Structure formats: structure tokens, C-alpha cells
Curated annotation (Swiss-Prot):
It catalyses: (6R)-5,10-methylene-5,6,7,8-tetrahydrofolate + glycine + H2O = (6S)-5,6,7,8-tetrahydrofolate + L-serine. Its EC number is 2.1.2.1. Catalyzes the reversible interconversion of serine and glycine with tetrahydrofolate (THF) serving as the one-carbon carrier. This reaction serves as the major source of one-carbon groups required for the biosynthesis of purines, thymidylate, methionine, and other important biomolecules. Also exhibits THF-independent aldolase activity toward beta-hydroxyamino acids, producing glycine and aldehydes, via a retro-aldol mechanism. This is Serine hydroxymethyltransferase. GO terms for biological process: glycine biosynthetic process from serine; tetrahydrofolate interconversion. Keywords: Amino-acid biosynthesis, Cytoplasm, One-carbon metabolism, Pyridoxal phosphate, Transferase. The record marks H224 as: Plays an important role in substrate specificity. GO terms for cellular component: cytosol. (6S)-5,6,7,8-tetrahydrofolate binds at L116, G120, H121, L122, S349, P350, F351. The modification N6-(pyridoxal phosphate)lysine is found at K225. Belongs to the SHMT family. It comes from the Bacteria. PROSITE patterns: SHMT.
């Protein structure tokens, strides 16, 4: 019996989602298109196998083949980032962060991470997150004029707070992060340094962003986004920390690992080790910079921090008459997918926001080049400037869908 015959409702929803992905232009910075190999691994018989523990040291029998798969993932990940130690079991980036905190901190310890409005992540100390509930969290922001990290201000804050851990990394920051400066700050106050490179991992792997491995005490990441793998997490560190990180994952915060997802991770890491991945990562940045230039040339759409060095950037829509939520919904209506984004010193609700975030990993996977990226940016500008003109929006949608359908993913 086919999948369609077995469950036509689920099958239909999946088919419709596939069609939606192909006909829309995906600009959510945290999304990408996984390869056929990655997707096949996740739908393989490995989903049937329980394997508590670690390769060659399990609590269950019958693990000889999942051991091979997980060890491949570990070895490839270590090679990709030059790490002494790697754990590929975290179910997500948030799980990886939770385990990293558990391994190095005690409940009530102080952490200093990037503020949400500055581009940080919920798990970097936001009060609504476990990281802001289990630990005393403090946050740093950006320089008011440059909208970039102010390392002297962060150092001053670290001296005042005296945190046990400093967290570097972001989910909406468009400039290079100087991990060596964070290391100096952490050393000065006697803190551990954790880097969350979830968004930039693919760029780091390609040598296009500084590598935090070997600088930070612990590095966490997701495996999708710029790495183009399955949805999941990883932890990288030094061998001396292996035992406590392993224990923080299992049995500390997870039970059985998802070996079918780990197989997908292994495939993605293998893909990222190939020479063509560096060209792909370079094109991501070129596309982001090409788009940012289009917005910079307008009078009412401002690129936060003045541009981008990576795969994303934020747009300040204050002068357009639209907020982030309205713009996200507007662009959805013309088959361009983005997300609303809080800006530095945001005054609106996180459900509304003053901006949107733009990312290029997904369109680059589909073969978009700089000319295509500029075309997309121009469509966005047209939609924003004619948000109440149904005829113009109809034309923008048609053009966006034609552009998308000429860059199909497999």
C-alpha cells in the first residue's frame, strides 16, 4: 500500500507543503533545503532503533550498525571544524545549549549573553527561556550608532556582572563576531566562553567566518540553517570536557538519540566537507550582500548595522508606514517568505516588531545568484512601496512565483 493510500490526509498535506516550498521564495534565515540523501536517512529504518548511550557503549543490544553511523557523524563533524571532541546527539540547538549550560554551570550561576533585541537567541538568557529561569541572566547589546558589538562595553559589563559563563553568537546579527575578543573578556573575569554558532556554522565550515572551535570552551550549533542538514543540534569542545558534556546530554537531558536524524547529520557533514560546499557558502554571502545593496539604495528601508558579512540582515521598516508583522504578511501574500524581527532598542511588541529578517541560505541552495537576489530585493521594495495596490501586488506575486519555479529544488 502506498503512502497516499495509507494516509491520504497526511500525504496530501505533505504534497501541498512541497508545492508551497517550490513556488515561494524562502528568505527565512534559519531555513534551508536538505538534500535527498539527508531526507532519505531520516525516513530510513534507523528510526526504529533505540540506542541509549554512546557508540560502542550502549545500554541496548543490536546497536552495531547505528554505532557505525553515529561514529561517522562524530568523525566528520570533528574534521569539519577541527575539533577534539564532538557530540551529535542533541535533538536541537536549544537542547545543545541546555546541555552545555548543565555541563559547565550550576543552577543560579550567572550568564552574560546577547539581548534578544540585539540579535540574540531565547536560550542566551531570555527571561521566558529556561536559560533565564535556571540561571541569573544578564544581557549585552550593541553600540547605538554602529549597531555592532561593542567589545569594550561588553568587557565593562562582564567586570560588573562577574558571570560564570559568557555566551557569544546570535540569531539575527549580520556582522563578523570576534571570538578572540570574547575569549579575552572571559579570561579576564574567569568565565567559561560558550559560542552558539547555529546560524553561521556553514560559513565557519567553509572558512568564511572565524572559527570559534579551539577558542571557546564549548561550541554549540544546529545542523540545518547554513549547514543544510537535518533539524538537530551538536556540541563541540575539548577532549578534557568530553565526559561532563556527554553526561549532560545522556542521561542529563535526553534519553535515546534519534539515530535516523544522526544519519542525516552524517550525510550533511560529508556534503559540507566537499569542495563545492565552500562555493555554495560564498554564494550565500554574495547573495545577501547583493540584496542589502538594493535596500540601502532606498530612502525608507534601512539595513540594520549598515550591511552584512554573513547570510542575513535585518530591515528597519519604521519609515515605510508598515511594521514587521504587516510586512511579513504582505510578503507572504506575494509568495515571499520572511519573518518579523525585533530591532535594537525595539519599542514594539515581539509579536509586531519594527523590522523583518532576510536570509539567503535557502535561495542559494536553489541556485539563485546575485542577479536573482537583487531581483527578489526589488520585488520586496515594490511590494512595500505599493502595499495597498492590489494590481501591483498581483504582478509581484506572479513574478516571484515564476522566479521560484525556475529554481526548483529536488
Amino acid at each position: 500500500m502506498s503512502f497516499k493510500e495509507l494516509d491520504p490526509e497526511v500525504w496530501s498535506a505533505i504534497q501541498q507543503e512541497g508545492a508551497r516550498q517550490n513556488r515561494t521564495i524562502e528568505l527565512i534565515a534559519s531555513e534551508n533545503f536538505a538534500s535527498k540523501g539527508v531526507r532519505a536517512a531520516q525516513g530510513s529504518v534507523l528510526t526504529n532503533k533505540y540506542a541509549e548511550g554512546y557508540p560502542y557503549k550502549r545500554y541496548y543490544g543490536g546497536t552495531e550498525y547505528v554505532d557505525v553511523v553515529e561514529q561517522l557523524a562524530i568523525d566528520r563533524l570533528k574534521a569539519l571544524f577541527g575539533a577534539e571532541y564532538a557530540n551529535v546527539q542533541p535533538h536541537s540547538g536549544s537542547q545543545a545549549n541546555a546541555a552545555a549550560y548543565m555541563a559547565f554551570l550550576q543552577p543560579g550561576d550567572k550568564i552574560l549573553g546577547m539581548d534578544l533585541d540585539a540579535g540574540g537567541h531565547l536560550t542566551h538568557g531570555a527571561k521566558v527561556s529556561f536559560s533565564g529561569k535556571m540561571y541569573q541572566s544578564y544581557t549585552y547589546g550593541l553600540d547605538a550608532e554602529s549597531e555592532q558589538l561593542d567589545y569594550e562595553a561588553i568587557a565593562k559589563q562582564a567586570r560588573e556582572v562577574q558571570p560564570q559563563m559568557i555566551v557569544a553568537g546570535a540569531s539575527a546579527y549580520s556582522r563578523i563576531i570576534d571570538f578572540n575578543k570574547f575569549r579575552e573578556i572571559a579570561d579576564e573575569v574567569g568565565a567559561y566562553l560558550m559560542v552558539d554558532m547555529a546560524h553561521i556554522a556553514g560559513l565557519v565550515a567553509a572558512g568564511l567566518h572565524p572559527n570559534p572551535v579551539g577558542i571557546a570552551d564549548v561550541v554549540t550549533s544546529t545542523t540545518h540553517k547554513t549547514l543544510r542538514g537535518p533539524r538537530g543540534g551538536v556540541i563541540l569542545s575539548q577532549e578534557k570536557y568530553a565526559k561532563k558534556i556527554n553526561s549532560a546530554i545522556f542521561p542529563g537531558s535526553q534519553g535515546g538519540p534519534l539515530e535516523h536524524v544522526i544519519a542525516g547529520k552524517a550525510i550533511a557533514f560529508g556534503e559540507a566537507l566537499q569542495p563545492e560546499f565552500k562555493a555554495y557558502a560564498a554564494q550565500i554571502i554574495k547573495n545577501a550582500q547583493a540584496m542589502a545593496e538594493v535596500f540601502t539604495a532606498t530612502e525608507d528601508i534601512r539595513v540594520v548595522a549598515g550591511g552584512t558579512d554573513n547570510h542575513l540582515f535585518n530591515l528597519d521598516l519604521t519609515k515605510t508606514g508598515l511594521n514587521g508583522k504587516q510586512t511579513q504578511e504582505l510578503l507572504d501574500s506575494v509568495s515571499i517568505t520572511t519573518n518579523k524581527e525585533a530591532l535594537p532598542n525595539e519599542t514594539l511588541s515581539p509579536f509586531i516588531t519594527s523590522g523583518i529578517r532576510i536570509g539567503t541560505p535557502a535561495i542559494t541552495t536553489r541556485g539563485f545568484n546575485e542577479a536573482d537576489a537583487r531581483h527578489v530585493a526589488e520585488l520586496i521594495v515594490t511590494a512595500i512601496h505599493h502595499y495597498d495596490d492590489a494590481k501591483v501586488l498581483k504582478d509581484v506575486k506572479k513574478e516571484a512565483e515564476i522566479l521560484a519555479m525556475t529554481h526548483l529544488f529536488e
